[in-house]
């Protein structure tokens, strides 16, 4: 389930806002220019679906947001817990950085944690299946896919080289807990 927690950047242990309600999440994020939406597939997406099948299932929303925001390229990324480069991939964006274009991701499956640092506040957004998040360019943030990453996401780009992280060199990301998604209870 999606979740937004907001902290003062000086207090990483106690959020002053905590919600799993999609409308409340969208409302709070809108205040800082971030888009949060829920999408639904126009056709079933089976595990192991090809990128083309994934994009076909969400074609109307992909076309809408691409037209609204001027995206030129869309792709599908899939990360599994058994990926031999998972630790390297996780570490790549764990520190505070920004991009020179909007970072827009739609979670087809799985989950990840976007953490935004805006105006002395830290916004921790757990994105799950059916969530779209659009982080404006130059927004300070970090992303954690967890120790056993599992997600399929549609990514949107305006420039082929725009999705380059520009790191701030601050230690703030290390002050906040890393992502550890809740695991469903085991069947007995």
Swiss-Prot record:
Point out the signal peptide segment: none
Respond yes or no to whether keyword Nucleotidyltransferase is given for this record: no
Instruction: Write down the position(s) of the site called Important to generate the dianion.
Output: 105
Tell me the domain of life: Bacteria
Documented EC number(s): 1.13.11.54, 1.13.11.53
Catalysis: reaction(s)? 1,2-dihydroxy-5-(methylsulfanyl)pent-1-en-3-one + O2 = 3-(methylsulfanyl)propanoate + CO + formate + 2 H(+); 1,2-dihydroxy-5-(methylsulfanyl)pent-1-en-3-one + O2 = 4-methylsulfanyl-2-oxobutanoate + formate + 2 H(+)
Q: Name one GO molecular function term.
A: nickel cation binding
* Cofactor: record remark: Binds 1 Fe(2+) cation per monomer. Binds 1 nickel ion per monomer.
GO terms for biological process?
L-methionine salvage from methylthioadenosine; L-methionine salvage from S-adenosylmethionine; methionine metabolic process
Residues with site note (May play a role in metal incorporation in vivo):
96
The reply to whether Zinc figures as a keyword in the UniProt entry is: no
Q: What class of enzyme is it?
A: oxidoreductase
Q: Please state the pathway this protein functions in, per its UniProt record.
A: Amino-acid biosynthesis; L-methionine biosynthesis via salvage pathway; L-methionine from S-methyl-5-thio-alpha-D-ribose 1-phosphate: step 5/6
PANTHER family annotated for this entry?
A: ACIREDUCTONE DIOXYGENASE
**Subunit description:** Monomer.
The protein's matches in HAMAP family, at most eight in alphabetical order, are given as: Salvage_MtnD
Described purpose of this protein according to its UniProt entry: Catalyzes 2 different reactions between oxygen and the acireductone 1,2-dihydroxy-3-keto-5-methylthiopentene (DHK-MTPene) depending upon the metal bound in the active site. Fe-containing acireductone dioxygenase (Fe-ARD) produces formate and 2-keto-4-methylthiobutyrate (KMTB), the alpha-ketoacid precursor of methionine in the methionine recycle pathway. Ni-containing acireductone dioxygenase (Ni-ARD) produces methylthiopropionate, carbon monoxide and formate, and does not lie on the methionine recycle pathway.
Q: Which family does the UniProt entry place this protein in? A: Belongs to the acireductone dioxygenase (ARD) family.
Q: What is this protein called?
A: Acireductone dioxygenase
Q: Gene of origin?
A: mtnD
